[in-house]
């Protein structure tokens, strides 16, 4: 498979991936424009595009409610925005491929492990912050000693593995999808007879990838709210 690289720039000694930065900003813009377009002229009885927006919001509520319980409304907008971002980020790389010489200029941000790890770290920070905010530092830290103080190392290890597994699950699925699609595109170059076969296979793979991308956005939000729910519902664990 032909090797391409993403253009980078250094700032204050830190190397930034320009393709990932621009694609991430584009994902945010697309998600914002979608919400802006579907939320214009809201009516009590929704019709048309407002139905689409409310259906997605209700779908996200259905994901998070079992995990957050009475705190569902507190985090519903965060979960909604997170779902939109991850879903669009997962799928944007399927639209096209832009390559200038050896530089790749178009990709799914979530096909980059740094992005997924960053999202997972953000989730971890929110979880700890909300746990401390809801219950105070003493009660929050005491929970790491449950059910016994001997479980402290395992509880700390669980926090680390949550971050790693959340990021690796998303990265592995999206990156693998882009690799397979790139291989199918290169298959079309073998001969003129391979082009229609590669096209059909690529269309089928894109459809399957969209489905997988939706599942991964669902799982990411589900696990995120599961982790948050465990932190904010400390006082209900024993009930």
Swiss-Prot record:
Keywords: ATP synthesis, Cell membrane, CF(0), Hydrogen ion transport, Ion transport, Membrane, Transmembrane, Transmembrane helix, Transport
CDD domains to which the protein is assigned, alphabetical: ATP-synt_Fo_a_6
GO CC field: plasma membrane; proton-transporting ATP synthase complex
Family per similarity comment: Belongs to the ATPase A chain family.
Name of encoding gene: atpB
InterPro entries named among the record's database cross-references: ATP_syn_F0_a_bact/chloroplast, ATP_synth_F0_asu, ATP_synth_F0_asu_AS, F0_ATP_A_sf
Spans through the membrane: 18-38, 75-95, 112-132, 166-188, 203-223
Recorded topology in the membrane: Multi-pass membrane protein
UniProt xrefs under PANTHER family: ATP SYNTHASE SUBUNIT A, CHLOROPLASTIC
GO biological process: proton motive force-driven plasma membrane ATP synthesis
Keyword GTP-binding included in the entry's annotation: no
Function: Key component of the proton channel; it plays a direct role in the translocation of protons across the membrane.
Molecular function per GO: proton-transporting ATP synthase activity, rotational mechanism
Keyword Mitochondrion carried by entry: no
Record text on subunit structure and interactions: F-type ATPases have 2 components, CF(1) - the catalytic core - and CF(0) - the membrane proton channel. CF(1) has five subunits: alpha(3), beta(3), gamma(1), delta(1), epsilon(1). CF(0) has three main subunits: a(1), b(2) and c(9-12). The alpha and beta chains form an alternating ring which encloses part of the gamma chain. CF(1) is attached to CF(0) by a central stalk formed by the gamma and epsilon chains, while a peripheral stalk is formed by the delta and b chains.
Compartments in which it is found: Cell membrane
Name of the protein described by the UniProt record: ATP synthase subunit a
Pfam annotation, one family: ATP-synt_A
